[in-house]
């Protein structure tokens, strides 16, 4: 007999936790749509030559390739005959949603309206080394606004407002969207004489490690043999990336102080101007100033970011790290089209976030059942009646399960409690004679009678009240 087991790097949930995960997906989707983003899905696998156009290096070593049994048999037969390998398999599983988006926009460019606002919430696959908290299959929840030839900086502010709306409704604790601009970093490095493009990118990658590795690690790296930057310059870099703002007015003051102390080179001036505009628009969008700040150490390790960059963290759980990140890029699909397609977007790695929240004990409170009521069956002769009650409840919008076999009432209550079902509906001879049903509320530990015709509406009111209390509790926090 084969031992049942899942591959390493997979998060498989039991129903109660799956419901909590699904509700987080629903919140994210609802807010994406509220801001006018349109849904897109792309195939789980792409043509290898399309998917791997601009990857190489570490990414290509993590890609899962796809082959049919027929293709494997043909390859084996060719090898037996001494033929050379045909190279990589034709198909590969996507490792993020950005490259498929680039292909999608380039392929459908003349059918889309620009700026194109898309959201995508699908699984991606990477051959990560198996370790706790790292996943080989995981959900990414992305939004992007793609322009044709140009895209206003105003969209960068709107994306920050989307981040705020999502995490405010998720209700998983206080959070902070940390904001920076790659032009700010590049302009500052230029003022120190670190102007060469590849060197700047390498320094940016090291700066992006400060929160994880610490300032001393970055200092040693930048002054070491690989970089050889003078200690005095590195000290200025570390002082610069230590800047954090506290409130809207302070953020603007920090930008003004930077401009006065360094002098506005063309690149630095652009970065400062863009951040100022984003900050003013974020205020107009109603994002509270406690929800965002400037953080000059935020660089984002990916080379294609060129302007605004975001990192979002939970205030009370910094060990979780970034829960949402993204930024501005100048040309999404340069490998697939000659058109210039600038954009701005973010990604929420929901699988890792959910796992981290569960580890921190922050999931239990929302892990309810999606079944609202269960109709108990105490006697075989009452089956038709129980099915009719369930039918009426479902018509009334109440998710309902029926016990199909008669059991002792205590066992049926026990089952409902373990399954997280709030209401148990009972209809015995006494209730039938009085034209009512009995309802046991397992949350409040109360039992009451309800007229049959009013059962669905009564339970709907109870559920709405519970939902309102949950929402007010989240708002209070």
From Swiss-Prot:
- Protein's gene: hisS
- Mind telling me which residue stretches traverse the membrane in this protein? none
In the record, the note on similarity to other proteins reads: Belongs to the class-II aminoacyl-tRNA synthetase family.
- Disulfide bonds, paired cysteine numbers: none
Reaction catalysed by this enzyme: tRNA(His) + L-histidine + ATP = L-histidyl-tRNA(His) + AMP + diphosphate + H(+)
Q: Which residues form the signal peptide?
A: none
Organism ancestry: Bacteria, Pseudomonadati, Pseudomonadota, Gammaproteobacteria, Lysobacterales
Which species is this UniProt entry from?
Xanthomonas campestris pv. campestris (strain 8004)
Q: Which InterPro entries match?
A: aa-tRNA-synth_II, aa-tRNA-synth_II/BPL/LPL, Anticodon-bd, Anticodon-bd_dom_sf, His-tRNA-ligase, HisRS-like_core, HisRS/HisZ, HisRS_anticodon
Naming one, the record's GO cellular component terms include: cytoplasm
| Designated name of the protein | Histidine--tRNA ligase
Q: Which Gene3D superfamilies match?
A: Anticodon-binding domain, Bira Bifunctional Protein, Domain 2
Database matches in CDD domains = HisRS-like_core, HisRS_anticodon
Q: What is its EC number?
A: 6.1.1.21
**EC class name:** ligase
Where does it reside? Cytoplasm
